């Protein structure tokens, strides 16, 4: 089952539809099933199109119920509904902030909750949460996007420990920059405040440098199948050739700071009882 927001799954940096080509059946969801027309025409009955707004919890439960009823079982659930929001923290409105969290975080939570009873009953299954390098590190201008992905990372790590005994696996896929429309027409942008013009320009230049060699979404197909087919899949895996170096530098910086301030941390514990 593949929930998506607006775009068909093949326009995401993680494309799981090679499962169809090897004989699997897929329930693909979108708010408007017309966006899934090409998939149905290409793959026929192997693709079950379902309408779903992932921010509607009841609708998520109903879509998962229908998918299970029509397909007979759920082997893999791929949560890749999401979009990017560009805006410095001061610029983001309440409505914009709530919508970013509703789609990117709560959407994945509702679909996950809806699928878990079926996966528990059958004694196996794999939940793929499409996160981002933005769930590990953080950059200016996309703070609310980071909040949504860090939340996804947190509940998914907890979930993996909660459901391991039921034979259910959880994997967070963390892509870096790919040649998709993530920062294009599918993105949302807050009204800019002139006070941030200088840092905005610097941020966009840094982003352009990071995106100088974007990844090919088509190459993720074999990667996602390798993760799904693995007997012991990872809890986290990067997609792309840049995230590991970036995350390593980020975590080394955190460790350095934690160690430098360890004496204060320990002092904050207070005297032992």
Tell me what each language-model feature is:
Residues 88-89, 96-98:
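Substrate-binding pocket helix/loop in short-chain dehydrogenase/reductase
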Residues 45, 66-79, 85:
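A glycine-rich helix->loop->beta "capping" turn
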Residues 132:
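Residue(s) in the substrate-gating loop at a strand-loop-helix junction
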Residues 112, 148:
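Active-site helix of classical SDR
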Residues 1-27:
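Canonical Rossmann dinucleotide-binding motif of NAD(H)/NADP(H)-dependent dehydrogenases/reductases
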